[in-house]
Amino acid sequence: MMTNWNFNKANKPLLLVVSGPSGVGKDAVLARMKERKLPLAYIVTTTTRTKREKETEGVDYNFIRPAEFQQLIGQNELLEWANVYGNFYGVPKAPIRQALAHGFDVIVKVDVQGAASIKKIVPNAVFIFLMPPDMDELTRRLEHRLTESPESLKRRLATAPLEIEKLPDFDYVVVNPEGEIDNAVSEIMSIISAEHCRINPRSIEL
């Protein structure tokens, strides 16, 4: 029997990947986390799509030209990238490495396709699926967003059930009903706390 010990819990930084279907509220949840000044490093996705009216360069996305995006691919400077609905999205590696080196938990927001790509490269990341309570609410959110053409809306609604089928590939699920963002944020922070209490902590290598 061990009667004397000196236990120091390892505090290895985490790479958290938040994903879910379009319209589930990924941007809104992360924005609320930033408002609450939670101690996380938020990685800004790079994209070639057009900036929406209320989006801010360098905050919501890094908006670049397709030629610049292709250059990043050629330099192997993207953790993952994908063509989503005709636009390119990618996660830059450099800020992730820097944040992890300084001991910060890193949070990345990607679509479901992107999460699958990251899991192949960094299987020890923490994968969180943000889930709508039902399809009707997801449809209402996309319609009220007023940023989608009829064709784009139809495509996103058709894709959502296929994305939700990927739920078993994730570690955790957080349901995000309309008007309950703070609950979703609290659940994500609980996941982070639990991960830091693991007997065998995750080790992230890029």
UniProtKB/Swiss-Prot annotation:
The lineage of its organism: Bacteria, Bacillati, Chloroflexota, Dehalococcoidia, Dehalococcoidales. It is an enzyme of class 2 (transferase). It comes from the Bacteria. Its EC number is 2.7.4.8. Belongs to the guanylate kinase family. SUPFAM superfamilies: P-loop containing nucleoside triphosphate hydrolases. GO terms for molecular function: ATP binding; guanylate kinase activity. It catalyses: GMP + ATP = GDP + ADP. Keywords: ATP-binding, Cytoplasm, Kinase, Nucleotide-binding, Transferase. It is found in: Cytoplasm. This is Guanylate kinase. Residues 13-193 form the Guanylate kinase-like domain. ATP binds at residues 20-27. Essential for recycling GMP and indirectly, cGMP. Signal peptide: none annotated. HAMAP family: Guanylate_kinase (MF_00328). The keyword Transferase applies. InterPro entries: GK/Ca_channel_bsu (IPR008145), Guanylate_kin-like_dom (IPR008144), Guanylate_kinase (IPR017665), Guanylate_kinase_CS (IPR020590), P-loop_NTPase (IPR027417).
